[in-house]
Regions:
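Bacterial N-terminal signal peptides that target proteins for export
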Residues: 1-9
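Intrinsically disordered, low-complexity segments enriched in glycine/proline and serine/threonine
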Residues: 5, 19-20, 84
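Bacterial N-terminal signal peptides
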Residues: 10-20
Length: 361
């Protein structure tokens, strides 16, 4: 009891010390811990357009491999927190084939994954080129390799999980909604299915996206091939998607880079064009890639902080590399083995009705 009383007295005297010091003009250093103000983090999402397994692309890859395809934008792909591409071919099995009825080798998406692509958009008009059996095999092969995809589903249960696809990226919950205007080959009424550009079917998908995610990214496969500007149907659909909760819209299918506009705070990239193909038309060789930056801060809702489009150019074998390569248009001319192709790229850029960079920083 005596020891307890002594401790109480000691504590009391310590409490009186600051008061005594103040009376004598003595300052006692007292530091109070202050929580640092939360700093915003940025989640970077990188998207490219259509990856096509044209016959000559596959022939070239058989001779030279895939390594040159995205060699010049590897830093963009791997530097992003999430990279997305439109895989516009099914894995329908042998014999492999290019346009007009695609069936690509399994090694192609394996390479795309190795180079850094994290999510594959399968909701496009070529995914049923080998019919429902080809789509079933595509899903099976993607699952077997652990590759994330959206836009299609093998069953009703899978459809709920994959459409939308919810991805956690550095704490950001991102919903990816992918669908197509139609398919070149018909589909059976049973599973597997492709997500269609149908408002009644998309309403529950968008509702799940709003409920489960912080940000809703919509990737529609739409529009008219080779048209450099969007049409009324695309614009009307974009406005409907925004009303349904879309924060960003990045489209594909036209095989050319289309115009872009801001609808309020929502950027709408109507088409990024191709990412890799054997198409010869000059507008189709000009490609787009988008980098999106989402600011995240503890206690605040994540929001779009930056959106930037850069131009790429699809080079054929012998122009820059032995095989195909998507290269930034800013790449110096010294990289070209074929100077005429560099001049062609510059002329195409000058004649394009698209502004090279759309940015919101």
């Amino acid at each position: 009891m005596k020891h307890f009383a002594r401790h109480i007295l000691t504590l009391f005297l310590w409490l009186l010390l600051p008061l005594a010091g103040a009376a004598q003009g003595i300052r006692f250093p007292v530091e109070f811990w202050k929580a640092p103000s939360p700093q915003p983090d940025t989640v970077r999402i990188f998207l490219v357009g259509d990856v096509l397994s044209h016959g000559r692309v596959m022939e070239s890859s058989a001779r030279h491999g895939y390594s040159s395809f995205f060699k010049y934008i590897e830093e963009d792909i791997q530097g992003a927190d999430l990279a997305i591409c439109n895989m516009e071919f099914p894995l329908g099995g042998k014999p492999y084939s290019g346009y007009p009825v695609f069936s690509g080798p399994e090694s192609f998406p394996e390479y795309l994954s190795e180079v850094g692509f994290d999510v594959f958009l399968l909701g496009n008009n070529h995914v049923l080129d080998r019919g429902s059996a080809g789509l079933s095999r595509t899903i099976e092969q993607m699952e077997l390799r652990g590759l994330r995809y959206t836009g299609v589903a093998a069953s009703a249960a899978a459809d709920t999980l994959l459409n939308p696809l919810i991805v956690q990226v550095k704490g950001l919950r991102l919903a990816i909604v992918n669908f197509t205007y139609g398919t070149n080959q018909g589909a059976s009424a049973r599973w597997p299915k492709v997500q269609r550009m149908n408002k009644a079917a998309l309403e529950p998908v968008m509702a799940r996206a709003r409920e489960k995610a912080d940000i809703v990214l919509v990737c529609p496969h739409w529009g008219v091939e080779y048209a450099l500007t969007h049409n009324a149907e695309q614009e009307e659909m974009a406005r409907w998607l925004i009303k349904q909760g879309a924060h960003v819209i990045v489209g594909s299918h036209p095989h050319v880079v289309q115009d872009m506009e801001w609808m309020g705070d929502v950027p709408v990239y109507y088409s990024l064009g191709n990412a890799l193909s054997n198409q010869n038309d000059l507008p189709a060789r000009l490609e787009g890639a988008v980098t999106l930056g989402f600011a995240t801060r503890l206690g605040e809702r994540p929001h779009l902080a930056s959106a930037r489009l850069q131009y790429l150019w699809c080079t054929k074998p012998g122009m820059v590399e032995d095989s195909y390569a998507a290269v930034p248009v800013a790449l110096p001319s010294t990289y070209w083995r074929d100077p005429a192709d560099y001049q062609t790229m510059q002329a195409t850029l000058k004649s394009s009705n698209i502004i090279a960079i759309f940015a919101k920083d």
